[in-house]
Swiss-Prot record:
Gene3D superfamilies linked to this entry: CAP, LCCL-like domain
Single GO biological process annotation from the record: face morphogenesis
InterPro entries attached to this UniProt entry: Allrgn_V5/Tpx1_CS (IPR018244), CAP_dom (IPR014044), CAP_sf (IPR035940), CRISP-LCCL_domain (IPR051957), CRISP-related (IPR001283), LCCL (IPR004043), LCCL_sf (IPR036609)
Signal peptide: 1-23
Organism field: Mus musculus (Mouse)
Protein name in the entry: Cysteine-rich secretory protein LCCL domain-containing 1
Pfam families noted in UniProt: CAP, LCCL
Entry keywords, A to Z: Disulfide bond, Repeat, Secreted, Signal
Domain SCP: 66-206
Cystine pairings recorded for this chain: 295-313, 317-337, 396-418, 422-445
Residue segments, region Disordered: 258-281
GO cellular component, one term: extracellular region
Amino acid sequence: MMCKAQEWLRVTALLFVARAVPAMVVPNATLLEKLLEKYMDEDGEWWTAKQRGKRAITDNDMQSILDLHNKLRSQVYPTASNMEYMTWDVELERSAESWAEMCLWEHGPASLLPSIGQNLGAHWGRYRPPTFHVQAWYDEVRDFSYPYENECDPYCPFRCSGPVCTHYTQVVWATSSRIGCAVNLCHNMNIWGQIWPKAVYLVCNYSPKGNWWGHAPYKHGRPCSACPPSFGGGCRENLCYKEGSDRYYTPREEETNEIERQQSQVHDTHVRTRSDDSDRNDVISTQQMSQIVSCEVRLRDQCKGTTCNRYECPAGCLDSKAKVIGSVHYEMQSSICRAAIHYGIIDNEGGWVDVTRQGRKHYFIKSNRNGIQTIGKYHSANSFTVSKVTVQAVTCETTVEQLCPFHKPASHCPRVYCPRNCMQSNPHYARVIGTRIYSDLSSICRAAVHAGVVRNHGGYVDVMPVDKRKMYTASFQNGIFSESLQNPTGGKAFRVFAVV
C-alpha cells in the first residue's frame, strides 16, 4: 500500500486524519492562467489582500461544486432512502476561506474539526476546475464496500480496499446537507515534504459532519422513502428536498465575518499621524530575486544585473522548440528552462531553477536526456550551469555565514523559511548589521523583517550572498535597530528578497 501511495504522490495524494475527519486529494497537475485569473482582483492582485466582501470562490465554481455534489449524492449505489439535498452555506464558506489562507496541508482549525467535516484538495500545474477534486473524492467509491443493515450489529463495519475512502463517504453522508468551499493560491506550499511553487488549494467544509464511526454513510432503500419529517415528503431527483432550500445566501459587498469586520473597523477608523509613521518607520520591500521566464527565454536575453540567478519556469517546456546547446555546461544562448529539464532539475511541470555563470568554455557536447536533444558546438563561448532550488527552515538566529557564505564567482542559498516572532529574539544573538545590504554575521530572518521582506509572522525569503562591503549603515526599520560596522576584518555580505 505504501508503494502504491508513493506512485500516486505526483498524481493523486490522499491523507487520512483520525477523528473521522475526511481526508485530502492532491491531483498533480501547469498553465495556471485560466484558473488564476478568476482569483485575482481588478488590479491584478491575488486575493491574499482581498477587499472587504471579496469572496474566496467564484459564483460559477460555487454552483458547479454544489451541483456536482447533489448529482453524485443522487446516484449512489446501493440507492439511498434518506439522502438529503445539499445547499451552500456562507458561514462554512468563510471558515473554509480562513483555513485555505493558512496554506497548511492538514485539516483544521482544530477548534472546528469536532463540528464540521472537511475535504481538501490541491494541485499545481495545468488548469483543473474545483470539480475535478470533487469527482476524485467521489471516485474512491471503487474501493468502498457499503455496509448493509444485516452487517451492522450494532456497529457497521468500515471496509475500504484502497488508501482511503473517507473523502467519498463525506461527500455522500446523508445528513451532511450544507457545504461551503474556498480556493486560495498558495506560494511554495509544503505538500508532504515537496514544495509546490503555486498550489491551488481547495477547502470544502461540511455540516453536519459525516464519517461517524460505526455508521453507514446513508440508509439503503427506495429513494426518499426514509426522509426526515422536516422535509414534508419533498423529493427531488432521489434527494430529500424542502421547497426553497436551493436558495443560498450571498453576502453583500460590505459584509464579512465578525472577526474580519471588527478588524476592518479598527483599521478604517484609526487616523494615522506623522508621529505614528516616524515611530514605526515601516518599510515594505516586494523586490524579488527570482524572475518568471517563458520556455523560450535564453540566459543571454535575461541575465542582466545582479539578480539573475534564480528563475521560475512554466509547464510544457518539453513541447517548446527553443534550442539547448551543451550538456552539464550550457551555452548562454540556450533556453534556461529546457536546459533545466535536460539536466533533470525540473520536469515538464515547471518549477524553480538556480543558474550559475561559469565563464568561457572551449566546446559544448550534445546529448539526449529527459526528452530533450541538445546541440553540440565547438567554438568558445560563455557558459552556465543549472542547479535545484532547495527550501530550508531556519531559526531566528541563523546567519548567512553559517548557511551559505559567499564564494566567488557566486553562491546559491536555499530558499529559507523564517519562523514567527523573530522581532522578539535577543538582538545580541540575532544581530542585524547594515541596511539593505547586510553583513553575513546578521540574522537572516531579522534582517528580512528589518528590510520589509517579511513581517513578524514569518514566511519565505530568498537570500543572495555577495562580497563584503567596507561599511554597513545602521537604521531603525519595522521595529528593529540595525548596527553599523566599518572596515570589517572578515566575513561577507548578503541581500534579502521577497518571495511572492
